[in-house]
Amino acid sequence: MNNDKTILSVAVTLVLLGSIFFVIERVLARGRNRAQPIIRKGWVTDIVYWFTTILLTKPFVRLMLFLPLSVLILAKVTSLDVLKMGAYTGFGPLSRQPIWLQAIEIYLIVDFCGYWNHRMFHNGRWWPFHAVHHSSEDLDWLGSLRVHPVNDLVNKMVQVTPVLLMGYNPTVTLSTAPILTFYAIFIHANVNWDFGPLRSVIATPVFHRWHHSREPEAWDKNFAGLLPIWDILFGTYYMPKDRWPENFGICEPMPKGYFGQLWEPFASNFRNSKKTDP
């Protein structure tokens, strides 16, 4: 596929998702969403993230996944020839399970690893990279891909590497990605849906939008991307029943443009290191 077709495919994806989420945010959730314009602050920056994440970061992530695959080659679990042919189907007892069972287990592993990786990015030198994602003040589906490449790369490696090294069929692993990706976009949507009795069972837009809230009581809460059980077990669950999340963004300054946001985490860590020098 040439570059023009690839760029066009991203544009088509944006139009399709934009249509879907227009219905979700503006029609189905009318009266149960935060009042904000469709063309809101930061929308151009978010569009740039969609193109760069899909066209640049995603291919680099795939390249980096050769690291765990090289471990399997060195361990003689598979060979480069088998990988080239696309005939690698995993190894060990886990790969011989029914596909549906592998998929369920992969969802659990990916979400569990993602939970702890997410917590890591809320601390120390990792936070400035994740702060880019939290900088959206008018949170909606479009802002879901406002993710610094370092954050995106580490997150994908942490989630996928254990699954590959445990022997799961990589085809099954790849098949779970579109569902997880769409759901990650959905929980950023500007809708105050909490799924009623399922609010503690599956992550919802309200659950995740509390995670993005600037209110101090919501800081460092609701890290899970799919199952709130991890937050419940580890004491980071926050879902008040008497109000909705409203105020989003971060307390520290963040450049508005794409390139400024790419550089800011490095600059922030450099500034902080200078402050702590004797």
PLM regions and their residue ranges:
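Membrane-water interface of alpha-helical transmembrane segments
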Residues: D4, L8, I39-T45, G167, ...
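Generic structural signal of hydrophobic/aromatic residues within well-ordered alpha-helices
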Residues: V23-I24, A35, L67-S70, L198, ...
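Membrane-embedded catalytic scaffold of the fatty acid hydroxylase/desaturase
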Residues: F51-L65, L74-A75, L80-L83, Y88-E246
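Membrane-helix interface linkers and caps
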Residues: S19-V48, P68-F91
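Hydrophobic transmembrane alpha-helical segments in integral membrane proteins
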Residues: M1-L16
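A membrane-cytosol interface segment of integral membrane proteins
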Residues: P245-P278
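A transmembrane-helix-recognition feature enriched in membrane-embedded lipid enzymes
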Residues: D46, W50-F51, G225-L233, Q261-S273
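Generic detection of long, well-ordered alpha-helical segments
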Residues: S9-T13, P37, K41, V172, ...
